Amino acid sequence: MAYFLKQSTYSRGLYLQIYESYHDKNTKTSRHKCYKKLGYVSDLINDKVSDPVSYYKNEVKKLNDKRNKELEEMKIKKIGEDPTRNFGYFIVKDLYNTLELEKELDPFKYMCGFSYPISSLIEALTYSRIINPCSKLKTFNEVIPYLYENYAFSLDQIYDGLNYIGSEYHKFIEVINYCINKKYGRNTSTSYFDCTNYYFEIDFESDDKQKGPSKENRPNPIIGQALLLDGDAVPLNMRMYPGNESEKPKIRELIKEMKEQNNINGKTIQVADKGLNCGDNIYDALIHKDGYIFSQSVLQLEEKEKKWVLLDNDYEEVKDNEGNLLYKIKACVDEFPIRVSNEEGKKVIVNVKQKRVATFNPSLANKKKIEINKLVEKAKGLCHSQAKKEEYGESSKYVKFVDEDGKKASVLINQDKIDKDLKYAGYNLIVSSEINMSKHEIYRVYHQLWKIENTFRVMKSELDARPIYLQKRESIYGHFLICYYAIALLRLLEEKVYKDKFNTYELIDLIRGFKLLKGEDKNINLTKKTPNVTKLCDMYKFNADYMYLSPKQTEKLFTYAYKVK
């Protein structure tokens, strides 16, 4: 097997392609296939490449040197090769089959010009991400080779493919959405939105890696990720953006894109936390005949509204079965002013009719008061030790730095701020366009936001989404597209296939736990028997708990298609 530069003469000129030779097991002869189309020599000449033929001959030499090195490493590795294989990803592969994703992704091979199907690469990277999230180099060496099925990609093909899907990530999201809509439909009566960001261990900004407000309070450059979920908590859309951009406009962009791509004309209620609550987002939802349920900071309300929140009048107590107070809730409907941008970009005041739902949670109040008192104690200690301003961190909000006529600033405890925060601890406010929705329903819908927070948690912890080893923007976006596919398929399994019989964490444990020793005529199942393994096998009559699995029995696990009810 080797690469070579193919030179073809046409009427327009000399056309270059990199070809790959390989051994055909069926015909037992050497064959060739296109690895990469380069183009006409006249089009390839630029400031950096004066002689395309010589340049790409050198590139081919690099490819061959790299392949030879990989082959040598594989020979060394074969001495102690582990026959253990993971086959648990059949759970996700069967959903991939059900959605017919391979068929819908197949046309991309005509667009990208690769010699391998892009669908197979996405499959291999998605399954690998769920099984063992790690760098692409480690995925190539230590994860893909130990999948039960054979996914034969070179490291260069993985990087090239990742770069391509990153450059077109919105199209790949459109494809999986089409497949989900076709098989399962979508609940878009409500949509949940939130943003997060990921930091990079670099000092200088580049591309979309820009310095901005980090969710982890780090000074490093970050990249932003906006995520939209449907009413069943299955991902609907994703947008990556530079770390120095505001997250507030992203909800409008994603809702608009989601409706256009899925031909949705009906109303969707946008649900988001106070970070996304601004006049422009509220006004945009209303003019597009959508609704919204946002939280709002009680501390930023006008004084008369704060008084209404604190008044005990009209609060209804909600208790558990043992009579313990869970929370108090009340609501009002009125016209409230919001600031929106007009056509000239200037802010103007517009009155909108809103339902406002105030709540008081005693356990949250106790938690907040403990946090406030800890910060106050820290601030007092730093005051006594004459610490520098930057050492205060979050506790700085409870001190005042007073400059005494050009002399060194003195530090005073801000008792007014402390008293204010303690007074409003445990109180929350939700604002909504849904006048006719009950206060309890608004409260319930808003608190489903934990699902999107949990989605980010799964992506960051279980799928290890932070792209530590990637630098190019397209490769980073490709990495997040793989994470998006992984979480979308897992959520779909949880909500639509298994109907909450397994949560996402349990599904990941199941997938990682199914292992076998691969043999010639039989496979030995190494999977530990657990209640969830038994439940899964009983539900779908899978034979994945047998001690011995023939190759035919094992392969059958990967060809199952879930019934769509």
PLM region spans:
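Short amphipathic alpha-helical "interface-anchor" segments enriched in bulky aromatics
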Residues: I442-Y469
